[in-house]
Amino acid sequence: SAASDVYKRQVCGKDKKPRQAIEKLSIDGPYLLKADDGSMRAISVDGKGRLLDKHYKSIPTTFSFEVFSDNGERLFPVTIHSVSRPKWKDVQPEKTFVLSDPHANWSCFASLLKAGKVIDADYNWIFGANQLVIIGDVFDRGVDVLPIYWLIYKLEKEAEDAGGKVTFLIGNHETMVLGNDLRYTKKKYTQLADTLGMTYPELWQKSELGHWLKTRNSIQVVGDNLFVHAGLSKEFLDRNYDIPTVNEIVSDGLFLTKKERNADKGSDLSFMFATYGPIWYRGMVRSADKYHPLDRDDLRKILEKYNVNRIFVGHTIFDDITTFYHYKVIAVNVDNQENKEKERGHGVMIEKDGSMFVVYDSGKQEPLLTE
């Protein structure tokens, strides 16, 4: 069978000399790989480390499945829904809950969504017509990548049905992993891809979640707030982009390698994935010269150009929710585990009147104070 061939290739290598026996796979998936002929392959690893590889001639319209965490906890069911690129601009709802960089840490992600009253104990959307914004970076560092993506995917549909919205923006770790830069990717993921005889990005490229990621935006405006993973630089301002163009360019390059993205030096594609592009630029929140810090006048021009009052970023990690340029830039990336344990800030709730609150894992909310 194909599976035993894969096993032989994995254990023996191409020259059939035995390699070290493979370590047991750990709970993962499902990866739903859709083919052009309408068929689907569902790949997952169960609690006993067994690879499950099911083929469906056609996809039932209400196809659903259970999602499990890496430690074997049954989390929630997901039903597949149609996927398209969200509008880049939304009207300000009553409440907008903002967080970033979950990095495959399931317990911290779920804890924060419960604290913000976004989900109930069974991971269902209870945030009504409000909006959840996640500023990138689910991949890497942790072992629960798929449960977090599947929860975001599931909540997106539930929010829509309730008149609300879920916004997931592309972070640098999405661009790294999908571009085959796996320096921070846990072994369980690369091992599964090896066992299947493909690269890890190939496993994503054909999948339902991969298709979903390719339709995500990189910059989103909600009311008078702009959200972007890392920041907007003077170089970005000088290139005079409109937001839909940025979103399209990042999507076009999402599954390309670094070499392919940089093939045409100075191109828009190359710029988006480089140091001063929106996915990597740290100069809004770092003042050392090497980061090309943004001066106040250029920030004013950026805010004017995109007709917003402030910018929220993730990417650069701080001890707590931190503000810059008198509230005009707000950094929301914190150490998820440490901030949960030490009861430090973890997310931001924006009210319709513009007031902002730091949200703690305990559910406590305190007004966000300026620097």
Feature roles, as predicted:
Residues 83-92, 123-126, 160-161, 218-220, ...:
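A short acidic-Thr-Gly-centered motif at the start of a beta-strand
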Residues 141-227, 232-243:
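Active-site neighborhood of divalent metal-dependent phosphoester bond hydrolases
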Residues 99-100, 132-136, 167-171, 228, ...:
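Active-site neighborhood of phospho(di)ester-bond hydrolases with catalytic His/Asp-centered motifs
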Residues 61-148:
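N-terminal active-site segment of His-dependent metallophosphoesterases
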Residues 2-7:
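Short, small-residue-biased leader/transition segments that mark boundaries at the very start
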Residues 329-371:
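Binuclear metal-dependent phosphoesterase catalytic core
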Residues 193-195, 217, 225-295, 299:
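Active-site-proximal loop/helix segment associated with metal-binding centers of metalloenzymes
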Residues 105-106, 140-143, 174-179, 234, ...:
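Active-site environment of divalent metal-dependent phosphoester hydrolases
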